[in-house]
Amino acid sequence: MEKNISRRIRFEQALKLGDEFGVTRQELTKRVLKKEKYEVYTLFQINVVANWGSTGRIAEEIGQMAIKCGWKSYIAYGRGKPKSQSKLIRIGNKVDMYRHALISRLLDNHGLNSNKATRKLIDRIRDIKPDIVHLHNIHGYFLNYALLFDFLKDAGIPIVWTLHDCWTFTGHCAHFIFIGCDKWKVGCKHCPQKLSYPTSWLCDRSHRNYKIKKMVYTSIPNLILVPVSDWLAGLLRFSFMKEYSIRRIYNGVDLMTFSPQGNTLQLRRRIGVIQRYMLIGVASVWSARKGLADFVALRRKLSIQEYAMVLIGLTQKQIQELPQGIVGISRTNSVKELAEYYSVANVFVNPTWEDNFPTTNLEALACDTPVITYQTGGSIEAIDEKTGIIVPTGDVEILTQSVRQICEDRIIEEGQCRKRAIELYNKNDRYKEYMSLYNELMNSLHK
């Protein structure tokens, strides 16, 4: 009896949400009766991590939205010990991952190992019979993409693939803007980033990898690509994936968590910036590509008496090497504390040389903090003239001028950044776009 009541409540929730996603109650009821259960469809996501890091959280929250809409949700992942509202499936184990990484470093064949783990995954997919398979990052030493796609090409399951970087259509690297490489457009070889992720110590098989990826990925008849920025969508149209349908869906943020924090005076006192303008920079890993050297150069241009500078996400070694006038903070696990740092800052500076669509820009906007970014990849798409400034990549002089414009001239009106975040980057709105896409695919199959 209790189970039936629970099912009825979930079904009523699915009907209510179904209205939002363009699925009529008649159609939804028909699907329920056809399957004789209240979980209307089954979503199966694959990502290197689950409920951790940016891509892991995105997969988790898409799964949560699917569950709210009456779907069953599975997430298959490669590493970690996550908790999830979805049903989790671990792909392989640590030993398998280390073996995959070692072979990849020796033979430059990243993504072509983990055979046994991938076959077990395929068996689980066969057993579960999902209605949608949603791929995220399938690189990271945990999966054999050739085996997986050989199964998917004949499985008849609609495939959605969210692209968070460029690894899919290159012969080796995940990013190439920093070094200005265009070999991926015609066929990679003599890779200038052989020692970058995924590192290869000995071989350069980028040309072979490129050909294998092209053959494997273009074998799928029912694939929709979902880049998370217009910039990445533009690159796809020059890649060997250009014939596939492309649907850009931006990432979003939790607007309840990332919001203007009221009492920031205590934080300012703690870091000693009560009467100064404050710049903030945030990264999960700081490197030259993320603009660490640019922050050091910017520090020399701005008066220490007038401007405080705080960088979050540094290693202890990096903190020790910082010049005077930069406060270094290691990675914070408290999202509330991170929101406080965004809120207390006068401007969020993101001098990234290579990025797809950085979530940090969105988090800053949600806390009503203006953003300055280099003219890099999809980073510029987060802002407009009312919410920030775009600076030519590497131009520290203009970067300095932009900081002064926002802090001293106050060219950004209070409330505009938060308004843009609400209108464009509410994570629930973005996940509803995924649900609409899923329902489009399901409706097309039932016509």
Specify the residue positions occupied by each region the protein language model found.
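Short acidic/histidine- and often glycine-rich active-site loop of Leloir-type glycosyltransferases
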Residues: 320, 375-390
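Aromatic "clamp/platform" in nucleotide-sugar-dependent glycosyltransferases that forms part
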Residues: 353
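Short alpha-helical donor nucleotide-sugar binding micro-motif in glycosyltransferases
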Residues: 340-345
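Conserved donor-binding/catalytic core segment of Leloir-type glycosyltransferases
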Residues: 226, 272-290, 296-299
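A charged, aromatic-enriched C-terminal amphipathic alpha-helix characteristic of glycosyltransferases
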Residues: 411-445
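Conserved acidic donor-binding segment of nucleotide-sugar-dependent glycosyltransferases
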Residues: 385, 389-396, 405-410
